[in-house]
Regions:
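Short, aromatic-enriched amphipathic alpha-helices that serve as compact interaction elements
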Residues: 2-18, 25
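A solvent-exposed, acidic/Ser-Thr-rich amphipathic alpha-helical stretch
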Residues: 4, 21, 27-75
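Proteins with a high burden of low-complexity, intrinsically disordered sequence enriched in S/T/G/P/A and R
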Residues: 11, 37-38, 76, 124
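Hydrophobic pocket/interface hotspot
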Residues: 10, 22-23, 30, 46, ...
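A beta-strand edge to alpha-helix "cap/lid" segment located at domain peripheries
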Residues: 51, 55-124
């Protein structure tokens, strides 16, 4: 499987909220971090922490979709420009209530080793 196939498999599972399939794309010691507006909003270390976060996150959205707009690959790393759209299933704050739409554009930096994602950093 190519690195881009791995990325697309992860995104397909993410969009389907299939956490078990998502996790097959990651190595055991993986690191995930989300950076929004220059601030870290989430970080996990290891597959167990990632699974817990992924399961909580999947329940928060009625629907969610990442679309890959462009991909650059080199040195065991992929940089993907992502268009993100989601509809909340739960209230997150007074401004972000169930039914609210989220539309973001961001970049995902994915490091791959041994055919698995070992680090995923999402920037928006």
């Amino acid at each position: 499987m190519s690195n881009q196939d791995l990325l697309l498999g992860y995104i397909q599972a993410y969009n389907a909220k299939d956490v078990s399939e998502m996790l097959t794309c990651f190595g055991e010691g993986c690191v995930f971090e989300n950076i929004s507006g220059g601030k870290a909003t989430a970080r996990t270390e290891g597959k167990a922490q990632l699974e817990a976060l992924a399961r909580r996150s999947a329940e928060m959205f009625a629907s969610r979709e990442q679309k890959v707009l462009s991909v650059t690959e080199g040195q065991g790393r992929i940089v993907a420009e992502i268009d993100y759209h989601a509809v909340l299933q739960v209230d997150l704050s007074p401004d972000l209530k169930a039914g609210s739409e989220l539309k973001l554009r961001g970049v995902s930096v994915i490091e791959i080793s041994g055919g698995k994602i070992v680090r995923l950093s999402d920037y928006s």
